[in-house]
Amino acid sequence: MYGKVFFVPFAAVALGVAGIPAAAGHSSSPRTHVIEAQDDCEPTSFNAALNDPTACVGGGETTFDEAIAQLLDDGEVDDWEFDPDELKIRTGETIEVRGVGGEFHTFTKVKEFGGGCVKEINDLLKLTPVAECEPVQVPGAPNGVKAPRGFVEDAVPPSVTLTVPAAKLTPGTHKFECLIHPWMHAEVKVRAARH
């Protein structure tokens, strides 16, 4: 019943998300802050449940059934998180989001926290997708294939680094969410740079 819960993002990757800025080095910004996109997926059970040998490529210990049970009991899964989940920075600084787990994640700026873009997870959690789940054309994909914007622009696959440039981090509070695992939140508070 829940076999396709995490499948959709991997199809998006295969269809052209590889064009995302990856493993970017430090820019000329005064400082770069690091956030890790973490999970603890156990590859054998996740890959079998999702019928996808690349659904989980990490070395975690949480089985697929344990993850679903935690999701149903707690509304989240332990160790699926952004670390840190709160950050204070100054204008002109950047953020690098590093995929250190075994699953595909997004680090998508949202107006408000809410449901993600995976129907099965939203159904389990009784959530409504955030507006940022609106599909966009996948670059390089045939036949007008579309995917949620975050899967295309804000992807953080395992072992990949997404850079959030200083230009997107204006003064104020910015909310970021994984559009696959919607309990993964981060808040970034940006203050004006010191002169």
Across the structure, where does each feature detected by a protein language model lie?
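Bacterial N-terminal signal peptides that target proteins for export
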Residues: 1-8
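Bacterial N-terminal signal peptides
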Residues: 8-18
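Extracytoplasmic copper-binding redox domains, predominantly the cupredoxin/blue-copper superfamily
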Residues: 19-195
